[in-house]
C-alpha cells in the first residue's frame, strides 16, 4: 500500500472561513472536519472496488493531506479500516457529490467486509448539492468540479480525469510503474485540494439566504437601485440579469437594479400553495379569503405568480428593515428566473 502525508501550506481555506460557512449549516458542530475524495475501479458498489482515498484533516492546528492507495485488490479492506480509524475524531465530512456516490459506495464496501460504517452519527456537507443553486446565477456550463474551478480562474490542473485514472490504475497493477502511480495520486490530490478551492463559493449562497446588509437604496423613476454588503468576500466577481433585474457582485458588495412597473414592485411569497392568483388583477390572495371568488377568476398560485404589488415609496427607501424584508424571498425568486447557460 502507498501511504502519503504532507502539510498544506497554501491554497486551502483558513480555519475561520471553514468555521463560518459550516456553522451556517450545522449548529452542533465541534469543528473536526475532513475533506475527502475516493477513486474506484468503477461505479458499481458490488462489482468494483476502492483503490484510493485522499483526505484533508486537522493535525497540530494545520491542514494535512493524506492518501492511501492500494497496490492490489486485497488491500481494499486495509484502506477501509485505516480510513475508519482516521474518521473517529471527525464530526463533519466535506465532499463533492459524496452524498450520492462516495459515501454510499464506501458504506457498501464496509458492509462487504463486515466493518461498521464510520459515517454513523457524522454530518455531511456535499458541495455539489449545496452549490447547485448557483448554476444559473454564475452562468456555469456544468456542475462538474473542474468547471467550478474554471469559474474561479483556476486552470492549473495537469492530471487526467477520473475515467482515465481507472485505465492508469489497471496499467499500474500490471507494470508497477512509479510514474503511473504518481499520475493517479496527482489526480486525486488535485480533486481533494480543489474541494478547498471551491469551498469559498459558499459565499454566493448568502445572496439566497438573506445574509447581508442593505447599505444603499435609490429610486431613479424606473428602477430600484440597492447595494448589499455580504459577511464574506466573494472569490470571483460575477454579473447576471434579465429584463426584470440585474445584479453584480465583487468582493463583499452586491449591486442590484430591479425594474419597477409604474413605480411599483412585486413582493413574492414563499408559501405559494396557500394563495390564489387572480389573473385579472395580477396579484394573489390567501386561499382563506379567496374561496368565495368564482373559479373562472382565480388559479392556484405558482412560485412565479405568488406576489402582490407595493409602491416604491419614500418610507420604503428610507427603511433598510423593509428593504431586507422585501429582498429576503423576492431576490431568490428573481434569481430563479435566470436561464441556465446553453
What annotation goes with each model-predicted range?
Residues 1-48, 58-342:
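DEDD superfamily 3′-5′ metal-dependent exonuclease/proofreading module
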Residues 53-55:
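Short beta-strand scaffold segments in enzyme catalytic cores
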